[in-house]
C-alpha cells in the first residue's frame, strides 16, 4: 500500500480564463478500486493526463507508483495481438497473460490474430489484461464500457472486481457498483472522496443535497424574519430618540435618562438582530455550492395518425458472406420504448439505419408508415463542428429549445461560444440528443446515445422519457437505463 498525494493542485488549459482545478488537495490509496465521476467537461480525463505528466500545473502530485492509461494507443493494429501485448510489456510471462485472458473469457487464439480484426470488446479485454500484467502500476482506466454489450460489460466488471489499484472513469451505474470500493467525484466547487460504491455515493449526495436545500429554505425565512424585525426595532429606536429630544408636542415632561436608556436598549437589540441576520446570510452562502442542477428537459412531440409506425417481418441483413441478423420480426407502435438487445455484431445498428433510409441490403419485409418523421442519433460524433447557433439553423430546429436543453444538461455560457469540435465526447453526444429532442418527429431512433454521457444527465434523460413517453427505438448497453426506460425488449440472436 502507498499513497498518491495531490496538494494544492491548480490547472487551466492554455488560453482559458477559468481554472479546471484550483487549490485541490486529496489522497488516494493505491490499493483502492476507485470510481471517478463528475459531469461532462469537469476535467476527469484532464486529471488522468495530469497524473501521466502530460500538462504543466501548479501544486504537487507525489506517488511511488507508475501510471498506465487505458485505452493505450496501438500504433500497428495490423500486428498480431501477442505482439501488441509485447510492445506494452516486453517482459510479460505467457502463462500470466493466458490466466488474465481466461478470467475475461477470451480464448488464446485471439493472440495470433491481427489486433485490428478483434471486436471492440475483445480489444478492450486484451488491453486490460496486458496492463494488469505489470507490477507496481496504478491503472487509469478511462471509460472502458463504451461500445461494450451488456454481456461484455458484466465480464469486464467482474474482472475489475477481482483487481485493485485503479481509477475507473465510467458513467454506467451498475458497472461501477460491481467493481469499485471508493468514489472520487468532481463537484461544482471541489473534489471529494467517499468510501463505498456508486450507489452509496449517490445516496449520500442526495441526502446532503436535500439537507442543504431544506437548510437553505429555513435560513431564507430566518433572514426575511430578522430583516423585518430589524426594521421594526430601528423604527422604535428612532421614535424613542425623538421623544428624548422633546420633539413630541404632548406637553408632558420628558425623563431623558429613562428615554436614553430605553433607546440604547433598542439600539443594542437592533445590532443583535443585524448580527444574527448577517450570520444567517453567511451560513446560507456556504450551502448549495455542489447541488447539481437537474432541471426537467423539454421535448418537441407530434402524434402519428396511425397506431403502428414501423413493422419488421422476417427481415434478414447480410453483408457479403456475413449474415448479421436473420428473420427479425417486431412492430413499433405509438408510445413504445423498445430496446434492441444483443451482442456486438448482431445487427442492432444495421436495423436502426435501415429504418432511417440507409441503403442496406436486406430480405424480408419492412413497412414504414407514410410520411413518418424520424429523428436519428448515431454513435458517430466525428462530423460535428462549428458553433451551436449555426448547427441549430442548419438542422432546422428551434434554437431556443435546443440551447435550453443543453443548458439543463450542464452546458455553461462559455460553451455556447465554442466550436463543437472542441467539446468532450459526452458533450458532443448531448448536442445530438438535444437536437433530437428539438425535432418535431413521430419516432426517435437512438443508437447508443449515452456513450460518454455523465450519470446525472442520464437520469435527466430517463425522467424526460418516462414523463413524456415519446415513441423511441434504441440501442443502449447501460442496464440501469434500459431497466428504467424500455417497455419492450427485442432480443437479437447471433
List each model region and its residues:
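ABC ATP-binding cassette signature C-motif
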Residues: 1-216, 300-494
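Extended, highly charged alpha-helical segments
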Residues: 76-78, 83-100, 178, 185-293, ...
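Coiled-coil termination/hinge junctions
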Residues: 283-310
Amino acid at each position: 500500500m502507498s499513497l498518491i498525494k495531490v496538494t494544492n493542485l491548480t490547472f487551466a488549459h492554455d488560453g482559458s480564463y477559468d481554472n479546471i482545478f484550483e487549490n485541490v488537495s486529496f489522497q488516494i490509496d493505491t490499493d483502492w478500486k476507485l470510481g471517478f465521476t463528475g459531469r461532462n467537461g469537469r476535467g476527469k480525463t484532464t486529471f488522468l493526463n495530469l497524473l501521466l505528466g502530460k500538462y504543466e500545473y501548479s501544486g504537487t502530485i507525489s506517488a511511488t507508483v507508475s501510471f498506465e492509461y487505458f485505452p493505450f494507443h496501438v500504433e500497428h493494429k495490423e500486428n498480431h495481438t501477442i505482439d501488441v501485448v509485447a510492445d506494452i510489456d516486453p517482459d510479460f510471462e505467457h502463462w500470466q497473460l493466458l490466466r488474465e485472458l481466461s478470467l475475461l473469457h477470451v480464448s488464446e487464439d485471439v493472440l495470433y490474430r491481427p489486433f485490428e480484426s478483434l471486436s471492440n470488446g475483445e480489444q478492450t479485454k486484451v488491453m486490460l489484461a496486458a496492463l494488469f500484467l505489470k507490477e507496481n502500476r496504478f491503472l487509469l482506466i478511462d471509460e472502458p464500457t463504451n461500445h461494450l454489450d451488456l454481456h461484455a460489460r458484466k465480464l469486464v466488471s467482474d474482472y475489475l472486481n477481482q483487481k485493485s489499484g485503479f481509477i475507473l472513469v465510467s458513467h454506467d451505474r451498475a458497472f461501477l457498483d460491481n467493481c469499485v470500493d471508493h468514489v472520487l467525484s468532481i463537484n461544482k466547487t471541489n473534489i471529494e472522496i467517499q468510501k463505498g460504491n456508486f450507489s452509496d455515493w449517490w445516496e449520500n449526495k442526495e441526502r446532503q443535497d436535500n439537507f442543504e436545500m431544506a437548510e437553505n429554505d429555513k435560513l431564507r425565512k430566518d433572514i426575511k424574519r430578522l430583516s423585518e424585525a430589524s426594521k421594526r426595532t430601528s423604527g422604535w429606536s428612532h421614535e424613542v430618540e425623538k421623544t428624548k429630544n422633546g420633539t413630541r408636542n404632548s406637553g408632558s415632561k420628558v425623563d431623558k435618562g429613562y428615554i436614553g436608556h430605553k433607546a440604547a436598549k433598542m439600539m443594542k437589540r437592533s445590532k443583535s438582530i443585524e448580527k444574527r441576520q448577517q450570520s444567517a446570510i453567511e451560513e446560507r452562502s456556504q450551502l448549495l455550492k455542489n447541488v447539481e442542477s437537474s432541471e426537467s428537459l423539454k421535448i418537441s412531440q407530434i402524434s402519428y395518425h396511425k397506431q403502428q409506425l414501423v413493422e419488421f417481418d422476417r427481415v434478414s441483413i447480410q453483408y457479403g458472406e456475413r449474415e448479421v441478423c436473420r428473420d427479425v420480426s417486431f412492430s413499433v407502435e405509438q408510445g413504445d420504448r423498445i430496446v434492441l438487445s444483443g451482442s456486438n455484431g448482431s445487427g442492432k445498428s444495421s436495423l436502426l439505419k435501415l429504418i432511417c433510409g440507409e441503403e442496406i441490403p436486406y430480405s424480408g419485409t419492412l413497412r414504414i408508415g407514410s410520411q413518418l418523421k424520424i429523428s436519428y442519433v448515431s454513435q458517430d460524433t466525428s462530423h460535428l463542428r462549428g458553433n451551436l447557433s449555426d448547427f441549430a439553423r442548419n438542422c432546422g430546429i428551434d434554437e431556443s429549445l435546443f440551447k435550453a436543453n443543453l443548458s439543463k444538461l450542464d452546458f455553461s455560457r462559455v460553451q455556447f461560444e465554442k466550436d463543437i469540435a472542441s467539446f468532450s465526447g459526452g458533450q458532443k453526444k448531448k448536442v445530438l440528443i438535444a437536437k433530437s429532442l428539438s425535432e418535431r418527429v413521430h419516432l426517435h431512433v437512438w443508437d447508443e446515445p449515452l456513450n460518454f454521457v455523465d450519470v446525472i444527465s442520464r437520469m435527466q434523460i430517463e425522467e424526460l422519457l418516462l414523463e413524456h413517453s415519446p415513441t423511441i427505438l434504441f440501442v443502449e448497453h447501460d442496464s440501469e437505463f434500459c431497466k428504467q426506460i424500455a417497455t419492450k425488449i427485442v432480443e437479437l440472436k447471433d
